[in-house]
Amino acid sequence: MDVDKLTLKVQQAINDCQTIAVRYNHQQIDTIHLFMAIISQEDGLIPNILGKMGADVETVKRDTEAELDRMPKVLGEGAQNASIYATRRFEEVFVRGEKISRDFKDLYISVEHVMLALMDIDSGAIKSILDKNNISKKEFLKALREVRGNQRVDTSDPEGTYDALNKYGRDLVKDAKKHKLDPVIGRDEEIRRVIRILSRRTKNNPVLIGEPGVGKTAIVEGLAERIVRGDVPEGLKNKIIFSLDMGSLVAGAKYRGEFEERLKAVLKEVERSEGKIILFIDEIHTIVGAGKTEGAMDAGNIIKPMLARGELHCIGATTFDEYRKYIEKDKALERRFQKVQIDEPTVDDAISILRGLKERFEIHHGVRIHDNAIVAAAKLSDRYITGRFLPDKAIDLIDEAGAMVRMEIDSMPTELDMLKRKIFQMEIEKEALSKESDKFSRERLESIQKELSDLKDKDKAMTAKYDKEKAQIQGIKELKTKLDEIRGQIEKAEREYDLNKAAELKYGEVPKLEHEIEEKENLIKQNGQNAMLKEEVTEEQVSNIVSKWTGIPVSKLVEGERNKLMRLSDELEKRVVGQTEAVKSVADAVIRARAGLKDMSKPIGSFIFLGPTGVGKTELAKTLARVMFDSEDNIIRIDMSEYMEKYSVSRLIGSPPGYVGYEEGGQLTEAVRRKPYSVILFDEIEKAHSDVFNIFLQIFDDGRLTDNKGNTIDFKNSIIIMTSNIGSEHLLNNKGVSNVDEETKDKVMNELKGRFKPEFLNRLDDIIMFKPLSINEIGKIIDIFLENIKSKLKEKNIKIDIAEEAKKIIAEEGYDPVYGARPLKRYIENTIETHIAKMFISGEISEGDILKIEGSDSKLTIVKK
């Protein structure tokens, strides 16, 4: 027996024979061991053929195992050291197999030759197993021809090339017949263009090019559905569309040339079909370079000749970037394909697509999807989710909203969960009290037993209600699944012209199921507001998902948020004292945006805050972030003093290709991409280079900016605040007046125009001038600073009282109109905080003490009460 003439699978089977013999304690390898080895091979040819014959491979295995168990076993110490020998019959199988191989005109002995040899030689155990499972040689040869076709075994691994299309692809037309594909709505123009190209004599290979998620694969599925319905020209009727899986084609190809063998086998099957099979390669750019090793051809070069001759009907799908990067580089491959550009559908088209898919999602999740949820998904995803494309992002929204509602149905309602926890807690308390004998414990035990009895009754009633509602929802899901299956059967019956069956299902089963579904839905509606479970996906759920994805609040305003927005000005003024005009402008911009009345193409607001140092410009931005987001973390702060050089603009949007930091992205663009709903503070803008401001023009006008990788960053949900000290000397001369007078405003504006270009200033929503703080306002700021000290000391359980005289001294000693409120803060830190800290460290004061801050002769004194 020449081992080189055996295929890899036969060599593997011989090795497996020895393992099987050792496992069953047999001293010799016989034909039954070989039979067991070849029917146990994973993805093997013999199990595949037996399956095609209708035999149960697992039953055959069990019968073979029983036969192996009956064979004589050799046990003991001597048996372990003894060698395992092959019987004469075992050798005869390969001699016979070689003859069968020659009859088949094959170059190697393959597993099918071995199987046929086993059928001829073993008339005992193997014959009885085959007879028992109705496996005859004649039927085996018939199934073998189906799988093998006219192929010869001319390689050591022929099994990888048998039935190649079914192994490495998926029949989309078959899936469409089985009602497995999602319905394709619209896209008629694109499908017609694909049909037109497929109908050509040569170069009949369309390639669908479009952004990810616009529905390229769906168009091919739509074509498969049209072929099933017969809604195609005569030349495409009864064609098969096979979706080729490049991953499984490459996977497991260990040896050189194995990948090419598999691909050639696929192409041979397509060629033999004489145009009946259309190959669909999703992500077609993967064929360029696939299987490429030193001196070998890649998949792209293997299919080129067939594409040019028109022997291979192929549909490709890829994105613009990948097409440019891989296909366009290879001009010979590019000219063999005809481009079909797939554009993103409009919002209205996306709504139609979602309406078509609605029923599938309802069946999958077992929920009811309202039409307003579908409209909201299309509109909100288009407006707020950037960087992705319709209809994919809208479908994802509906899918996740459905999953969220389903999860709530499957989880125990909060009310019932809390009740069960309370019962559990009281049961533990009851057990503990039952061991006590005092009067109080007995009284408490009686009270608990009574309360526990009531709670258990309530739990019983609520659990029954929950189970009933859940069963109703599950019942609807099952009925809808059944209805969908029946509709698939109707389509099949109509295709096969079985009109009696179609009519029976259409006018008998369908109305009956629809009536049952309606009855169950009415039962759920009767629960109304008292229902424990909600099985509806509404606009609210979709809005919540958008908010979770983007961080932008798009859900309907709840009462708490309404009050918060209406009190926004007051909340801001608690921290930013004396700047009413600035606070009002910012608050109004936020309210307009939240009500949905802002300009959709611009940021929520873009402001320049002008004024002397220490009057609250930066503080207003921080306070706005704190009030709106409950944290200052959502403020994106960029200190413009770091952008004094012309080239430093690249730090905002990212370095150009080839420069250090290209992969890291820009400080501004990356921050906004992660948190699109935020306050962006550009501090001290007059310090930056004038060219840096050119990138702001697009942000202010269109609410967008393109980063170094070509990604569009959306600023439409940001508040942009810039602070500057330009013209502060003019504003300082305005002190004591409640508002900035017109003359001062003109002087400041003239200075501002001298520093910034008109196109920059013209795009701003508002230029707000902060006036210097008056003595009255200083008093309020002192209160804010002192309140901070009180809150710090409260943690240490120390209280402080501050006399009015002390506040006057702080104002006189700490306030400087030129420097604003910052010197006040420093004065309070140096005099009050430092003094209290020293008293605490030295042990003069301890927890529970009350301190009194008094003032006299321009000095502060701190005494313990």
Curated annotation (Swiss-Prot):
Name by which UniProt lists this protein? Chaperone protein ClpB
In its UniProt entry, the species of origin is given as Clostridium acetobutylicum (strain ATCC 824 / DSM 792 / JCM 1419 / IAM 19013 / LMG 5710 / NBRC 13948 / NRRL B-527 / VKM B-1787 / 2291 / W)
Decide whether keyword ATP-binding is in the record: yes
Q: Where is this region: C-terminal?
A: 773-865
Q: Name one Pfam family in it.
A: AAA_2
| Subcellular location(s) per record | Cytoplasm
Q: Which CDD domains does the record associate with it?
A: AAA (cd00009), RecA-like_ClpB_Hsp104-like (cd19499)
Coiled coil region boundaries: 395-529
Domain Clp R residue range list: 3-150
**MF terms (GO), sorted A to Z:** ATP binding; ATP hydrolysis activity
Region ranges (Linker): 345-551
UniProt-annotated binding residues for ATP 2: 611-618
- Using the UniProt annotation, give all residue ranges assigned to the region (Repeat 2): 86-150
Q: Which InterPro entries match?
A: AAA+_ATPase (IPR003593), ATPase_AAA_core (IPR003959), Chaperonin_ClpB (IPR017730), Clp_ATPase_C (IPR019489), Clp_N_dom_sf (IPR036628), Clp_R_dom (IPR004176), ClpA/B (IPR001270), ClpA/B_CS1 (IPR018368)
The entry describes its oligomerization and partners as: Homohexamer. The oligomerization is ATP-dependent.
* Source species, domain of life: Bacteria
